[in-house]
Amino acid sequence: MTTGRAPTRTGPWPYAAWALTRAWLLACVFKVVTVAGPDVTVDVSVIYRSWYEVLLTGTYPLDDVTWQYPPGAALAVLSPALLPFWEYATAFFVLVLVCDALVLGLLLYAGRRPGMRAAGAWVWVVGVPLLGPTVYARYDLMVTAVAVAALLAGVRRPRALGVLTAFGALLKGWPVLLLVGVRKGLPTRAAWTSAALCAAGLAAAFALWMPGAFAFLAFQRDRGTEIESLGALVFHIARQFGWEGRVELRYGSMEFVGPRVELVSTLALGLAVLALGCCCGDCGPASSPCAPRPRRRSRRCCCSR
């Protein structure tokens, strides 16, 4: 956020708070500290590990309906191979920690620029541990690191924003929404063009790399309403008033099954498309992270040379 003042000196406090909170997260995922609820690390030690073994054979998980991710997700799942001296889950948690630290570094670096402040870094330091140990037991934080890098790069380089956004979208889809906020005009054309070209190139590379790069698209069609989705709020409330549905593990996620679930899923999908259309239509000059500064009007006479 631009404030028009000198950059704030943060001192050691963000680093200290980050170290303490991340030590707690690591203690949770390594089971030094017991947290109430299901064991979220199973997703890494069992599901991710099984995908890892399949990917090492030179193919995407063609027969596993729990594989619901774009082809770039293979890079995240295979990343623990960078640390072969540790077991899979340990290496994964350490790499997530590294990505967490990278985001903090990027936000603190951005906060040191003239006219900026470190509020974003503090939100990151405090907000991530509030998500609990689940945040270290998913590869979403790796995707977030790419998205944050894209936003910060886009302040001056919309093409860099486009390239990083395309890479992030092939990891887990949602970073493509960053393109919605780019200012109309030259920044939009630069960001969207670079994103399209990069996405096409990467998609082709993944398709040539291993068979089944886009098999996940067929696995998506039968998915229902996941319990953590916004549409599921209807059923969370309905259960308190006698709704006869239930929760089941289907297609790799906990979903609601029962009366009206298909209707709500269809409505949620339609509303999501409508919301995306509204965002694309309403993105304006004030919404851009890479909008050029307006030029000052010259005071000289319009006919002077």
Where on the chain are the PLM-derived regions?
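Aromatic/glycine/proline-enriched transmembrane-helix motif characteristic
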Residues: 92-93, 97, 235-305
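Transmembrane alpha-helical segments of multi-pass membrane glycosylation machinery
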Residues: 92-108, 125-128, 144-147, 270-277
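Transmembrane helices and adjacent periplasmic/lumenal helix-loop junctions
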Residues: 162-184, 305
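Transmembrane-helix signature of polytopic, membrane-embedded enzymes
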Residues: 107-128, 288-296
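TM-lumen/periplasm interface segments of multi-pass membrane proteins
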Residues: 2-117, 131, 220-228, 232, ...
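Short acidic/glycine- and proline-prone juxtamembrane loop motifs at membrane-interface regions
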Residues: 134-143
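Membrane-interface transmembrane helices that cradle and orient dolichyl/undecaprenyl
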Residues: 142, 148-160
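Perimembrane helix-loop-helix junctions
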Residues: 3-4, 176-210
